[in-house]
Amino acid sequence: MKPSAIVYTSNTGFTKRYAEMFGEKTGLCVYSMEEAKTRLEKGTEIIYFGWLMAGSVAGYKKAAKLYDIKAVCGTSLAPTGTLVEAMRKSCGLSEDFPVFNVQAGMDRAKLNGGYGFGIKMLIKIMSKKKNRTAEDNAMLELLIKGGDYVCEENLTGIFDWYNRI
């Protein structure tokens, strides 16, 4: 049976945009984690979208206690598809569980809490790194200048999975 809703946790809006984009194309209702608490019954089958923070998917553990998660889509600064195994490990998910990672973006002006400070520290560390790779340079540029990579093409993997179930 297909999931009946999408639940997301977003910090700067990129994850929300991906969840809404996926919902629009699939016809699934989309709820923030807060909205879902009052709109969905415990145990509802969902797809969970969350942003990656220090290697883990924000809000995943809380969502897993409330809902029957059928797939996880994490948004990050890294290129689409590159962090799937790290996400799987941090969430404690089996090899056959559907996990997806999509590149989102960076808007430092919208960062909440101490995350802005963390990004500043990461920029300092990466700037001092010797022998940076092309990937390191691209990430550093994204951290400094910001950027928006949200696009439907990045959701191809999760669309393919959804259409198969």
For each predicted feature, which ranges?
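N-terminal beta1-alpha1-beta2 submodule of the flavodoxin-like/Rossmannoid cofactor-binding fold
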Residues: 1-66, 160-165
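FMN-binding flavodoxin-like domain, especially the glycine-rich phosphate-binding loop
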Residues: 52-165
